[in-house]
Every structure is written in structure tokens, then in C-alpha cells.
Amino acid sequence: MSKLRTEDMSHPVKPLRSFLIQDILSHMGPGSKEKSLGFPKTDQDQDSSLRDTEEKYASEKLQSSSQPAEIHHSHMEADENLELDTAQPITAVENKLAKQQQKRSRAAFSHSQVIELERKFSSQKYLSAPERAQLAKSLKLTETQVKIWFQNRRYKTKRKQLATDMEEVEKSSAHPAQCRDTNISRTSLLSFYQNYQRYPYLYYLAGWPAPLW
């Protein structure tokens, strides 16, 4: 009897384990309930799994189809940025030209200033830097205004001289033709007079038509 007690005390007593379903499920994860119990999958579970698979496939397909659109959109943004970058220098050039045009606006000279400038130009077509500075100071103008006025005046003089030369060339080219026509008329008249023996007197020439002269 004592021997049995000694053997019982030598083996530790194992705690009792409950075989109730609630106790069993409490020691297991929510995902392994059906697997541990060996319950077969229902139609609802199969439909849910199939639906999840379809949704995953549709999501992957949507992502793959949206990538070209995103790439195209990024290319469009890059092109727009490039256009903006290339348009900026043009705008800068236009602004620069507008400022230059404003600076080149024609200055208004007074009557006395114009008279003095014309008097100086008639005696001297080109001015040195000291002469230009002295003239600008005497007329209360800037050296740039005096320089531009002389440049425009020289251009105007050359253009006027060129027009005069062209008129002279046209006149000189027209005179030989007129002389040649006159010589032809005189030659024709003399030939007609020599061949037409019935009217030998010169006084009859007054009765001929004017174009023959």
C-alpha cells in the first residue's frame, strides 16, 4: 500500500483538460477552427474564396492597364513642361525687343535745335566724339540723340541723292530714243520727198500730217 502511494507521488498529477467545444476553440486561432475540427467547406465559403480570387485578378488587371495611362500622362506633363521652358526664352526676347523699341522712340527736337543741327550738318557730315559731345552740350541733348540724328540725316541725304540720280538716268535714257524717233521721221520724209516727183515744191510740206515730222 505504501509502495503504491510512493509511486503515485513520484508521478506529477496532470491537469484535467476540458473537451468542450468552447474550451477547444479558445486555445486555437480563428483561422484554424474549421481545419482542426475537420469541418468541410460550405458553398458559401467556396463562393467567398472564388469572389476574393476574382477581385484580386480584377485589381491586378486594373493596375496593369492603368500603367500605360500613367506613363502617357507623365509624357504629356513632360511635353507641357518642355513647351513652357521653350516658351520662356521667346517671351524674354519679346520683352527685350519691346524695351528696345521704347528706347528707340523718336525724340522730339525743338525748332531751334533742328536749325542748329542742320547748320552743323551742312558744313560737316560726320562728327568726332569731342565735337558730338560739345554740340550735345550746347543744344542740351544727349550724345546718343545727336549721333542718331546725324545718322538719320545722312541716310535721308543718300536716299534723296539716289532718287535724283535715278531720275537723271531715266531722262538720259529717254533722250536717245526721242532723238532716234526724230531721225527716223526726218529720214522717212526725205525718202518720201525724193520718190514722190509730182510734188517737188517744199511749200507743200505744210499740208502733210504732223506725225511725219
From Swiss-Prot:
Keyword tRNA-binding found: no
Pfam families per record: Homeodomain
Main location: nucleus
Tissue distribution: Expressed in the muscle layer of embryonic somites. In tailbud embryos, expressed throughout the entire myotome but at the mid-tailbud stage (stage 32), expression becomes restricted to the outer periphery of the somite so that by the tadpole stage only the outer, type I cells show expression. Also expressed in the dorsal cement gland and in the myocardial layer of the developing heart. In all tissues, expression begins after terminal differentiation.
Source species: Xenopus laevis (African clawed frog)
Name used for this protein in its record: Homeobox protein koza
DNA-binding region: 102-161
Gene Ontology MF term list: DNA binding; DNA-binding transcription factor activity, RNA polymerase II-specific; RNA polymerase II cis-regulatory region sequence-specific DNA binding
